[in-house]
């Protein structure tokens, strides 16, 4: 009888071992499940937090990303940056000068051209003939002649008016002071010695001056 009880006890021992192993396995599985659930919760929370962060545009982030005060002061006192700023300012001044100077030069050239055009002799000039001494006077005394004509042409014209022959020379003077050369142009003399918009030419048959 005691032997049967011992065998029943021995036979029941493996069952108890299996139960204990199953219990331990179930406890371990529950711990693993809890760990996985906790990890998933943390991952989801982190992902949601990442998705909720606002995305700042690149241009705005550059503007907002300012340097600290000490680094900003270092940049302000950087000699390289100052020299670069000075060079840029010089280039800007040079550019402004280059853009202004041609305009002033053009205006100056225009003024010179206008002044030259005003002093330029007209196409025809007015000549007043004045006799010296007892030389015969002509009427009328005022004539208009082309500015490109020479003094030699004026001498021939006046000789025809006075009906002088070739043997009787005629001497012309400007402002009763000097004898112009025969090839000088009337327009050049008018530009230099005109009086009241007239070129006064004195004449006589003998040498009167010089």
Curated annotation (Swiss-Prot):
<keyword id="KW-0653">Protein transport</keyword>
<keyword id="KW-0072">Autophagy</keyword>
<dbReference type="Pfam" id="PF04110">
    <property type="entry name" value="APG12"/>
</dbReference>
<dbReference type="InterPro" id="IPR007242">
    <property type="entry name" value="Atg12"/>
</dbReference>
<dbReference type="GO" id="GO:0034045">
    <property type="term" value="C:phagophore assembly site membrane"/>
</dbReference>
<keyword id="KW-0813">Transport</keyword>
<feature type="region of interest" description="Disordered">
    <location>
        <begin position="1"/>
        <end position="57"/>
    </location>
</feature>
<dbReference type="GO" id="GO:0061723">
    <property type="term" value="P:glycophagy"/>
</dbReference>
<dbReference type="InterPro" id="IPR029071">
    <property type="entry name" value="Ubiquitin-like_domsf"/>
</dbReference>
<dbReference type="GO" id="GO:0019776">
    <property type="term" value="F:Atg8-family ligase activity"/>
</dbReference>
<keyword id="KW-0472">Membrane</keyword>
<keyword id="KW-1017">Isopeptide bond</keyword>
<feature type="compositionally biased region" description="Polar residues">
    <location>
        <begin position="1"/>
        <end position="11"/>
    </location>
</feature>
<comment type="similarity">
    <text>Belongs to the ATG12 family.</text>
</comment>
<comment type="function">
    <text>Ubiquitin-like protein involved in cytoplasm to vacuole transport (Cvt), autophagy vesicles formation, mitophagy, and nucleophagy. Conjugation with ATG5 through a ubiquitin-like conjugating system involving also ATG7 as an E1-like activating enzyme and ATG10 as an E2-like conjugating enzyme, is essential for its function. The ATG12-ATG5 conjugate functions as an E3-like enzyme which is required for lipidation of ATG8 and ATG8 association to the vesicle membranes.</text>
</comment>
<keyword id="KW-0833">Ubl conjugation pathway</keyword>
<dbReference type="GO" id="GO:0097352">
    <property type="term" value="P:autophagosome maturation"/>
</dbReference>
<feature type="region of interest" description="Disordered">
    <location>
        <begin position="70"/>
        <end position="123"/>
    </location>
</feature>
<dbReference type="GO" id="GO:0034727">
    <property type="term" value="P:piecemeal microautophagy of the nucleus"/>
</dbReference>
<feature type="compositionally biased region" description="Polar residues">
    <location>
        <begin position="47"/>
        <end position="57"/>
    </location>
</feature>
<feature type="cross-link" description="Glycyl lysine isopeptide (Gly-Lys) (interchain with K-160 in ATG5)">
    <location>
        <position position="210"/>
    </location>
</feature>
<dbReference type="GO" id="GO:0000422">
    <property type="term" value="P:autophagy of mitochondrion"/>
</dbReference>
<comment type="subunit">
    <text>Forms a conjugate with ATG5.</text>
</comment>
<dbReference type="GO" id="GO:0000045">
    <property type="term" value="P:autophagosome assembly"/>
</dbReference>
<feature type="compositionally biased region" description="Basic and acidic residues">
    <location>
        <begin position="83"/>
        <end position="97"/>
    </location>
</feature>
<dbReference type="GO" id="GO:0000421">
    <property type="term" value="C:autophagosome membrane"/>
</dbReference>
<protein>
    <recommendedName>
        <fullName>Ubiquitin-like protein ATG12</fullName>
    </recommendedName>
</protein>
<feature type="compositionally biased region" description="Low complexity">
    <location>
        <begin position="21"/>
        <end position="33"/>
    </location>
</feature>
<dbReference type="GO" id="GO:0034274">
    <property type="term" value="C:Atg12-Atg5-Atg16 complex"/>
</dbReference>
<dbReference type="GO" id="GO:0015031">
    <property type="term" value="P:protein transport"/>
</dbReference>
